[in-house]
């Protein structure tokens, strides 16, 4: 069979089908005669017995044909006499039922005997089973070789008359491919019979005159009929041995018999022996193509050629917008996206776009770790994987081998994603456990919604943020649960170095019940920001080493749940056995508290630099990290309670920190503030602090926070009413050091070292007293009968609206100042013992948020009951605009 160079020279039909032995003169398949004549003109020295094929053609896959072609249609067996007929005398179209004899030794002559609309797909398999022993062996070998490299085109060209009516081999290729993809059913044999014979006669009529006659005679003499029949007999079993391929084309294509070449090492199947040989090189380690300039070897020649360009510094592909050049065209196209800004690759999880596939794949590894189960593992093998398959194909070059590689890559990516889906599931459970900590919450049920369906929704919407706890269920309680931002001080570490989400509950072992109070606005999970997490984490690291527990002042807050005041942990708990609960009613805030997660897009670099700067400074700040040089505390209290407790003998040896340390901390706080404001797009000026005002008792200044707000609630009862008269900032972050009041028996910073807990000398208290005397007395008490004569007499106080707390708590916290005197250092823990929490949980303290003209928010707490003693609120406010003094006469302002 001659695959004429007419294919190479652009002839209409290149291969001869049934009449291949005639040299194309009587080519029954596809107008090969004319093209063969052109081949003779183009290559006069090319031997007639050899097959010319194009080595540049891609490696060809052989396709199986449906079993409907098992029986050779008689129309395809073209006789040699018809093929050898003189070109000037084209044979008349034979009768449809006439059986032609096949050319004897042409390896491709057997193909037309089985050729149907799917016949060319069988070409390679049939060739493998033919082993001619005559002089035609060389020629059939050429056919064999040709079908390895160009079988797709040759087979299509051979059968082009059946599809294209003799209009050319390329047309046949197109139709074959369309049939291959559309799985068109086989056309009736009679129809093919007519088409084949009529097209062959037409092609002979057109092009037969151009082919020399003697070639056909020579070929005819070389092909005896018996051998031809033997070959046909040999091929029948192969054709009939594939009845399993009956059915639609898809089943035939996917059939394993389509890949008859099996690897002995790994049992991989391949369509051709060429592919198998190339594959075996991987097992043997043989690299037949060695680089002449280095020791690298390659299993394919094109890889070597591409590698040699590195040595020759040849970069044929240049960017038209800059001077960069590239070895591969794909690299140039990928580079051009940097100029155009095109980002064609999209992450299905977080909807980010990327210009390069490697960046997308790298992102998917990190994105998959943060995304929760609801976003990725719900359908681990669906859209993400199909998209990745397409993505991998897009990212590679145009060669078929690279596409095969990308198939395996995409499969590997799918496996990885399935694994990450599983790991995400385990990480979610870890998230839940870590953020629940050791909370004993018998009252929290599915309605509480810690681990409810709302979590999945939150996680789908906030993929890059840490796991937010919240519930989107609408329950009876319209409350916000503001979380303590530093739960890790208790001793647990949260995931990825961050504290828990904004609704994580910081509870202690003694806490028996904490009602998860929910907000109807469904925005609980978004009060936090990454900036807060960084602050919390950095402060957590300071206190964790010396964290201790004080079970003497644990409080059961179960009775707080029944009240209408909202349990809000707006501050940081540095207690082990107390639950930080501050009370704010959220019914007036639901409409105003905005979700903050979309504003918390602080880059990881900023957070890392914050932590790095903090860790660098922490060594030099161990002595007193939060001392303030010039504390200014204005106490607005009523006249009855204007006296400040001076009985507590603070250690006079503790001095304020040096100016350099204060300036260093001031610089750090400004740096954090700038980063925070930049990250939140200046949407609010309030940083983390509430300016809390407790009215009816003396206040104790603790100079622990430089450039920060200092909040010490007086030993009053901090039950909070439901009157919230102004708007919270649009997104209120968690304070790094929060207000600890209301439910706390007392604040002790036991996590601080003794050097950390030393207070400033008594002159600071004198400043407090002076500032208190200069302020107006307040008449804004809800209970007029509350009078504090001194802190030692607070056990005798009466409250008209409060519920009495168990007397043992009161007794345990009376007159402990005497125990503090012998101490060389003053600890806040002792302060808690001295002025323990004698509060009435039923009382209400209305919280008022006043926004001045500068957009700064002042928070005023009106205490209605005066039975709470010794409770301190400390809150570190990073945002400097919040340091304006409250102008109301009923408040205690802290700057």
Curated annotation (Swiss-Prot):
Basic and acidic residues compositional bias, start-end: 130-140, 202-218
Biased composition (Gly residues): 7-36
Sequence positions bearing Phosphothreonine: 888
UniProt biased composition (Polar residues): 379-398, 648-660, 778-789, 797-815
Pfam families linked to this entry: zf-C2H2
Modified residue annotations for Phosphoserine: 395, 484, 651, 785, 807
Sites of the Glycyl lysine isopeptide (Lys-Gly) (interchain with G-Cter in SUMO2) crosslink: 2, 101, 128, 213, 219, 225, 232, 242, 259, 301, 325, 373, 409, 416, 460, 477, 493, 498, 539, 599, 617, 622, 661, 670, 787, 792, 795, 818, 840
Zinc finger (C2H2-type): 261-283, 289-311, 317-339, 345-367
GO biological process terms held by the UniProt record: embryonic body morphogenesis; negative regulation of DNA-templated transcription; negative regulation of gene expression; negative regulation of transcription by RNA polymerase II; positive regulation of DNA-templated transcription; regulation of DNA-templated transcription; stem cell differentiation
Molecular function via GO: DNA-binding transcription factor activity; DNA-binding transcription factor activity, RNA polymerase II-specific; DNA-binding transcription repressor activity, RNA polymerase II-specific; RNA polymerase II cis-regulatory region sequence-specific DNA binding; sequence-specific DNA binding; sequence-specific double-stranded DNA binding; transcription cis-regulatory region binding; zinc ion binding
Subcellular localization, as worded in the UniProt entry: Nucleus
UniProt main location, coarse: nucleus
A Gene Ontology term for the protein's cellular component: nucleus
Disordered as annotated region, ranges: 1-44, 63-113, 130-149, 183-253, 377-427, 638-660, 778-817
Keywords on record: Differentiation, DNA-binding, Isopeptide bond, Metal-binding, Nucleus, Phosphoprotein, Repeat, Repressor, Transcription, Transcription regulation, Ubl conjugation, Zinc, Zinc-finger
InterPro entries per the UniProt record, alphabetical: Krueppel_C2H2_ZnFinger, Znf_C2H2_sf, Znf_C2H2_type
Family: Belongs to the krueppel C2H2-type zinc-finger protein family.
Function: Transcription repressor that plays a role in regulation of embryonic stem cells (ESCs) differentiation. Required for ESCs differentiation and acts by mediating autorepression of NANOG in ESCs: binds to the NANOG promoter and promotes association of NANOG protein to its own promoter and recruits the NuRD complex, which deacetylates histones. Not required for establishement and maintenance of ESCs. Represses the transcription of a number of genes including GAST, ODC1 and VIM. Binds to the G-rich box in the enhancer region of these genes.
PANTHER family linked: IP01015P-RELATED (PTHR24377)
The protein, known as: Zinc finger protein 281
């Amino acid at each position: 069979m001659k695959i004429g160079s007419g294919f190479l020279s652009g002839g209409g039909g290149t291969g001869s089908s049934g009449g291949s032995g005639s040299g194309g003169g009587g080519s029954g398949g596809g107008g090969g005669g004319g093209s063969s004549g052109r081949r003779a003109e183009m290559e006069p020295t090319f031997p007639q017995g050899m097959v010319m094929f194009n080595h540049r053609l891609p490696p060809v896959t052989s396709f199986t044909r449906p079993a409907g072609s098992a029986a050779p249609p008689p129309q395809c067996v073209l006789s040699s006499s018809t093929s050898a007929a003189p070109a000037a005398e084209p044979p008349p179209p034979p009768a449809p039922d006439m059986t032609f004899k096949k050319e004897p030794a042409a390896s491709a002559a057997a193909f037309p005997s089985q050729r149907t609309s799917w016949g060319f797909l069988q070409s390679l398999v049939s060739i493998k089973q033919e082993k001619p022993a005559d002089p035609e062996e060389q020629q059939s070998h050429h056919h064999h070789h040709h079908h390895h490299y160009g079988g797709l085109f040759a087979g299509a060209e051979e059968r082009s008359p059946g599809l294209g009516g003799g209009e050319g081999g390329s047309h046949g290729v197109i139709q074959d491919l369309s049939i291959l993809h559309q799985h068109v059913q086989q056309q009736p044999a009679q129809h093919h019979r007519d088409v084949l014979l009529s097209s062959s006669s037409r092609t002979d009529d057109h092009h037969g005159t151009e082919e020399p006659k003697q070639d056909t005679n020579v070929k005819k003499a070389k092909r005896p009929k018996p051998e031809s029949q033997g070959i046909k007999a040999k091929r029948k079993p192969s054709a009939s041995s594939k009845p399993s391929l009956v059915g639609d084309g898809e089943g035939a294509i996917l059939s394993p018999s389509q890949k008859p070449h099996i690897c002995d090492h790994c049992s991989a199947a391949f369509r051709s022996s060429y592919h198998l040989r190339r594959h075996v090189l991987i097992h043997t380690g043989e690299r037949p193509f060695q680089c002449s300039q280095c020791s690298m070897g390659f299993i394919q020649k094109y890889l070597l050629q591409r590698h040699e360009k590195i040595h020759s510094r040849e970069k044929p592909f240049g960017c038209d917008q800059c001077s960069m050049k590239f070895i591969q065209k794909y690299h140039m196209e990928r580079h051009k996206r940097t100029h155009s800004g095109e980002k064609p690759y999209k992450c299905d999880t977080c909807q980010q776009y990327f210009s390069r596939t490697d960046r997308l794949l790298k992102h998917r590894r990190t994105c998959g770790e943060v995304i929760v189960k609801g976003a990725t593992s719900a359908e681990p093998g669906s859209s993400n994987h199909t998209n990745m398959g397409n993505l991998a194909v897009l990212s590679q070059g145009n060669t078929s081998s690279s596409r095969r590689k990308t198939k395996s890559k995409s499969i590997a990516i799918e496996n990885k994603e399935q694994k990450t889906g599983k790991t995400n599931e385990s990480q979610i459970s870890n998230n839940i456990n870590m953020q629940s900590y050791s909370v004993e919450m018998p009252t929290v049920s599915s309605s509480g919604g810690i681990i409810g369906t709302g979590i999945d929704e939150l996680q789908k919407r906030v993929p890059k943020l840490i796991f937010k706890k919240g519930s989107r269920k609408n329950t009876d309680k319209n409350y916000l649960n503001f979380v303590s931002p530093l739960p890790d001080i208790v001793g647990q570490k949260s995931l990825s170095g961050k504290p828990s989400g904004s609704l994580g509950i910081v509870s202690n072992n003694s806490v028996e019940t904490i009602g998860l109070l929910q907000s109807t606005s469904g925005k609980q999970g978004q009060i936090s920001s990454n900036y807060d997490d960084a602050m919390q984490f950095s402060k957590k690291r300071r206190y964790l080493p010396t964290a201790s527990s004080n079970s003497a002042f644990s409080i059961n807050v179960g009775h707080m749940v029944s009240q209408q005041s909202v349990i809000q942990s707006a501050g940081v708990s540095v207690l082990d056995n107390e639950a930080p609960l501050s009370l704010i009613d959220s019914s007036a805030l639901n409409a105003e508290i905005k979700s903050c997660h979309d504003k918390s897009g602080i880059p990881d670099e900023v957070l890392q630099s914050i932590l790095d700067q903090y860790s660098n400074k922490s060594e030099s700040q161990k002595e007193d990290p939060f001392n303030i040089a010039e504390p200014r505390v204005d106490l607005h209290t009523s006249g009855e309670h204007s006296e400040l407790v001076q009985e507590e003998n603070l250690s006079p040896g503790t001095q304020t920190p040096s100016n350099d340390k204060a300036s260093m901390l001031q610089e750090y706080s400004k740096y954090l503030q700038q980063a925070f404001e930049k990250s939140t797009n200046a949407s609010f000026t309030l940083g983390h602090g509430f300016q809390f005002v407790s009215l009816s008792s003396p206040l104790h200044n603790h100079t622990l926070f430089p450039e920060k707000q200092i909040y010490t609630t007086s030993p009053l009862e901090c039950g909070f009413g439901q009157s919230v008269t102004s708007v919270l900032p649009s997104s209120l972050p968690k304070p790094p050091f929060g207000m600890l009041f209301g439910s706390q028996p007392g604040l002790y910073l036991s996590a601080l070292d003794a050097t950390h807990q030393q207070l400033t000398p008594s002159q600071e208290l004198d400043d407090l007293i002076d500032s208190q005397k200069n302020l107006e007395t307040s008449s804004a008490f809800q209970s007029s009968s509350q009078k504090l004569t001194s802190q030692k007499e607070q056990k005798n106080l009466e409250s008209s609206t409060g519920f009495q707390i168990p007397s043992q708590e009161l007794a345990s916290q009376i007159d402990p100042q005497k125990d503090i005197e012998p101490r060389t250092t003053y600890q806040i823990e002792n302060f808690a013992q001295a002025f323990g929490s004698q509060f009435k949980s039923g009382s209400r303290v209305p919280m008022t948020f006043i926004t001045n003209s500068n957009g700064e928010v002042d928070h005023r707490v009106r205490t209605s009951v005066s039975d709470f003693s010794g409770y301190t609120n400390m809150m570190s406010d990073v945002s400097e605009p919040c340091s304006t003094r409250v102008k109301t006469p009923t408040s205690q302002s802290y700057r």
